[in-house]
Amino acid sequence: MSAEQKKYPRVLIVSHTVLARNTSMGKTMDTYFSGWDRDAIAQLYIQSEIPTDPLCVNYFRFTDPDALKSIVQRRRKGTVFTEADVRTERADPVEMGNLTGVYNYGRKRTPLIFLARDGMWRLSGWKHSGMLEWAKSFRPDVIFYASGDYAFSYRITRFLSEKLGIPYVICCFDDFYLFNPNRDMFLGKFRHNRFMKTARETLDGAAKILTVNDTMAEVYGRIFGRKCGVVWTAGNMTEMPEIPEKQGIVYLGDLGLGRNMQLSAIADAMRESEGPGIPEYLDVYSAETNPDILEPVKSNPGIRFHGAIPGNQVREVIHRAKAVIHTESFDPVIRERVRYSLSTKISDCLASGTGMLAYGPAEAASMDYLIRNEAAFTATSPEELREVLPRLFTDEAEYRRIVENAKALARKNHRPETTRETVRGALAEAAAGKRE
């Protein structure tokens, strides 16, 4: 192995979705692997998508429809994409055709769907799909597995590792292990126990385990008996010019997981709070289209809903605002769901120079992170929210202190070069035979 290859080993990425810069996962992977030669990265993925960004130039796709058809056609092959097949003119990588309805039904995360999908992959001919031959032709030094909540992708990762004789590194972006959303449903506990058996075997065999925040690393370290590394989400550190009069309060992003109700509660608290400077409206920017999720937002007289905006305008909207919101739900089930997750948008908000208002349960990893580092105006109850809002808009000394704390935290944990080096170091050490 050359000195360059020791530093930047050839990496086979295994994940469910294709690499695309217009998705959170794609942006994250773009940061992780920006130092690599594109020829030294290949991706194996599952979803019915086509490459739209040349983040690498070697892809192998084997989808659910392929798996289903291969039960009968045992030698059904997967699809190989090269640089010539990358469709940069397309904004959306999804390629569904007439299977959209079937696929969307299959995405419903019920115990029966989980078990049926995993059973289909067990019966399928994915081992004879050309996957191994394609991987051998790429000659990877190490596998980077972006873990998910379906057992079959863990088995694929172990299979390739064993057949190629190379180690794998697992990166846990979300909590699929402690939280079982289906525990009260028929077969929910049975399905989760089966999944955890496969996940534990795969985690035990990993050269390294990476997580996306220190809370997750600590908890997983105790549960799985392994040292877990932390690779923080990178933020945009580019300095923006000072704005003399920042105005307004904004929220940008997903409205699911109860965030719609939280935003409505914040707008109500703004209207009820006494004090100068509190804006009349909360401005919400989101690509959400589900009418049931949108209803609490659109019906609140204190919220102006703007829909989606282009990604290149997000920083400008945050920068011009006096405050940007991060929120998590108090709903008991959702609280457990997000307990160990850290929003990918927090890193950009920390670096923005705009004060953050964080509203949610104290035990959520994102809330705990901001509270511990005094990097936001935080409220963990409706009463505390009504108390903190006037201070956010009137106490300039506290505002400046919190903004500076946030920027310092961004520089410490969320610099793109730090994130890249953490991932590069983990993969290089794994390829060299080091295990933690």
Identify the function of each model-found stretch.
Residues 42-124:
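Conserved N-terminal ligand/cofactor-binding loop architecture of enzyme catalytic domains
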Residues 47, 201-228, 367, 423:
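A short, active-site helix/loop in glycosyltransferases that binds the activated sugar's phosphate group
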Residues 130-133, 155, 159-163, 176, ...:
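Membrane-proximal helix-turn-helix segments that form the acceptor-binding/catalytic region
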Residues 215, 233-234:
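Carbohydrate-associated surface elements
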Residues 236-238, 242-297, 304-312:
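Conserved catalytic-core segment of nucleotide-activated headgroup transferases in glycan assembly
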Residues 258-261, 312-314, 324-350, 356-368:
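Nucleotide-sugar-dependent
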Residues 343, 361, 372-383, 391-397:
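Conserved acidic donor-binding segment of nucleotide-sugar-dependent glycosyltransferases
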Residues 380-383, 396-427:
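A charged, aromatic-enriched C-terminal amphipathic alpha-helix characteristic of glycosyltransferases
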